[in-house]
Amino acid sequence: MAVPREPDQVVRLFLDLMERRQLPEAQALLAPDFAMTFPGNVSPPSLDALVEWAKNRYRFVRKTYEHVEVCGTDHEHAVVYCSGTLSGEWLDQTPFEGIRFIDRFELRSGLIRRQSVWNDMALHTIPQP
């Protein structure tokens, strides 16, 4: 897998790989000290743990990007913000769409060091199977 040089392209590749559940390839884009935080102060210790946590929330989720912004211009350190909406399917196979999200990524030396996630998913009723 060719790793992009531009911070926004690294982030988009990571998110695309995560959506397809290509975890080893996604892991290759992460710094050794990578940390992630999701709504409710959930901080899964690994990508595998994130997927396990998500299994209790929805069957799948996709992102539609409205904005991707890069702060910082050098490749040593950059912050990338992605915002848009989530769509997918709840556990009972009911579709959802239009749920707002913002992801903030910190990159150092071309690798993702931190991901912080905010979304409005909690404002929507999550049907149970």
Residue ranges: model-predicted function:
Residues 54-57, 84-98, 117-124:
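A structural preference for long, well-packed, hydrophobic secondary-structure segments
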